[in-house]
Each structure stands twice: as structure tokens, then as C-alpha cells.
């Protein structure tokens, strides 16, 4: 009976300890200080196991959070700035072949992350394609109604079809011209980290 009580006590203590540990995990946006700590730690020790990185570096973040922060923002080879028109066309071509296999698509765009490409596709390209498709359907319906009400000739109808094709071509061109300004003001770029790192003259984590 006493042994059972001790076991229950140990289990309860373990659960309590886990809950307390989970309660100390930071969530939300990363600070510049956290970026600097993670950057310097990986610079000196390498990536390794991310759960170990989170604990050894002293960051109160999960291993997954550290991994995503490094891969998507702090890696020296991460490409900065907006996605170019050339990259946009390549994404469209690759998506037609590979579908939503973002990691495979990212391999063809050096410096771009799979998460960045996925977000660009869903928020920019996919949205504009949907709007363009709806506009095209409305345009065709409008042209069809005008054709029936005015008793257009075959030759006139052919002319309208050509106009419709031209309009669709213009809409298609407009659809993919969706590269917009993307703000990186909330993040500390690696370009900001390096000067600080060099001025300190110290490779150790602060």
C-alpha cells in the first residue's frame, strides 16, 4: 500500500513538473535578443537536435520554434526581399507539375523556404487566379446575353469571341503580376546580426 502511494506521488510530481516547464515556454514574436542568442549558438555549435539547441542555448522556446526561426529567417543563405517575377513564374510551372509539394518546389528556388513559397502561392497567386476566373465567367455570361438580345450575326459573334480571348489573355497576364511589398520590419536580419557579432569580438552566447 505504501509503495503504491509513493508511485502515485512520483507520477503526480512528474506531471506537475512538466506543466510548470510548459508554462515557462515563450510564445509569440521573437525578440532581437533571442535571435542573437540562437544565431550565435548555432554559429558555434551547429544545428544538432533542436530540442537540445533550445535547452542548451538558454532560450525558453520549443525545439520546433527554434528550428523554424533558423530555417526561415536567420540562416545566412536565406534570400531576402520580395519574390521576383521570374521566381513567380517558376513557382507556377513547378506547382503545375508537383502540386503542393512545397519542399520540393523550394529546392528549385535557392534561398527561398518552403513556408515562404506556400504562403506566397496561397495569398497572392491562388487568390488572383480565383478572382480572374470569376471575372472571366462574368464576362462570358455578359457577352452571351448581349449576343442573344441583339441578334448578332455569326461574323459579329466571332469578333466578340476574339475580344473575349484577348480580355482573358490580359486578365491572365494581370493575374500573375502580384509581387507586392513584403515588410520585414519585425525581424532582425542576419545583416544586422553580423555587425553586432563582429563588434563584440566574441563568438559566445550572451
Curated annotation (Swiss-Prot):
SUPFAM superfamilies: Homeodomain-like (SSF46689). PROSITE patterns: HTH_MYB (PS51294). Keywords: Activator, DNA-binding, Nucleus, Repeat, Transcription, Transcription regulation. Its main location: nucleus. Gene3D superfamilies: Homeodomain-like. GO terms for molecular function: DNA-binding transcription factor activity; promoter-specific chromatin binding; transcription cis-regulatory region binding. Residues 50-74, 102-125 bind DNA. The keyword Repeat applies. Residues 1-11 have a biased composition (Basic residues). Residues 1-20, 138-162 are annotated as: Disordered. Transcription factor acting redundantly with MYB21 and MYB24 to control stamen filament elongation in the late developed flowers. Repressed at the transcript levels by DELLA proteins. This is Transcription factor MYB57.
